[in-house]
């Protein structure tokens, strides 16, 4: 299997409380993989913004981080997607505020639109830190899609590179497949059987993907969700 190669890593940057932490995480990731880092800011360029970005990037200049700051105005989703194509980004990092119901946040945010439409790998960063904190857990979407095998493989290769403790593959099931009106014991049993069959089907599909990944990358880290 070929080693994962992120020649260019992009990150969408906004002036949120996590800006410095997001930049630091992206810079460390770029250095780890020997990648160029592209900061994508949706908005007009200004001297103040540029100085802020340069200030946060300055600790990594001595480590020979190659980077570029890109300013573009427009719709956030359109700007980020077009910028990843223009700059030939292999991995896009998006800072996401963690909420109690992360799934609800993910499904209702622009992050979903970007992850569905992006032509590159996407990493949602929910616990950024200014100082390095070892990554312990990666969650990857295992939905049925032509790109899923590549996505899951990349997640395990990255996890191996970062030394994570656990990689969770989350399976998505269409609600229409499990839509059964439960109004008596018979319909309840039917609903339970359908859900169990779907669970077994999805687990078998994901395990088939995992069987193609080197065992030393998946050993003691796999969790299906």
Where are these predicted regions, by residue range?
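A short acidic, glycine-rich active-site loop
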Residues: 189-201
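A short, acidic, amphipathic alpha-helical segment used as a generic capping/interface helix at domain edges
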Residues: 205-210, 225
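Structural motif
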Residues: 49-51, 77-82
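Small/aliphatic-rich secondary-structure junction motif
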Residues: 1-55, 59, 63, 136-192, ...
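Gly/Ser-rich helix-loop-strand patches that form or flank binding pockets
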Residues: 81-131
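Well-ordered, non-membrane alpha-helical segments in soluble/globular domains
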Residues: 53, 199-206
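Charged docking surfaces used in two-component/phosphorelay signaling
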Residues: 71-79, 222-225
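Rossmann-fold cofactor-recognition segment
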Residues: 66-69
């Amino acid at each position: 299997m070929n080693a994962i190669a992120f020649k260019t890593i992009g990150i969408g940057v906004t002036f949120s409380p996590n800006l410095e932490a997001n930049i630091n995480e992206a810079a460390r990731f770029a250095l780890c993989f020997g990648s160029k880092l592209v900061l994508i800011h949706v908005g007009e360029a200004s001297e103040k913004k540029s100085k802020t970005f340069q200030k946060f990037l300055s600790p990594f200049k001595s480590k020979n981080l190659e980077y570029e700051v890109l300013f573009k105005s427009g719709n956030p989703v359109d700007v980020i997607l077009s910028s990843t194509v223009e700059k030939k980004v292999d991995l896009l990092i998006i800072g996401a505020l963690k909420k109690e119901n992360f799934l609800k946040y993910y499904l209702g945010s622009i992050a979903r639109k970007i992850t569905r439409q992006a032509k590159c790998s996407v990493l949602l960063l929910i616990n950024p830190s200014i100082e390095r904190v070892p990554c312990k857990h990666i969650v990857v979407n295992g939905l049925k899609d032509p790109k899923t095998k590549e996505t899951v493989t990349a997640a395990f290769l990255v996890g191996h590179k970062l030394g994570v403790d656990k990689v969770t593959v989350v399976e998505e099931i269409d609600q229409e497949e499990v839509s059964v009106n439960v109004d008596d014991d018979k319909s309840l049993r039917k609903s339970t059987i359908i859900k169990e069959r779907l669970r077994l089907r999805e687990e078998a599909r994901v395990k088939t993907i995992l069987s193609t990944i080197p065992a030393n990358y998946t050993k003691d880290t796999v969790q299906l969700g």
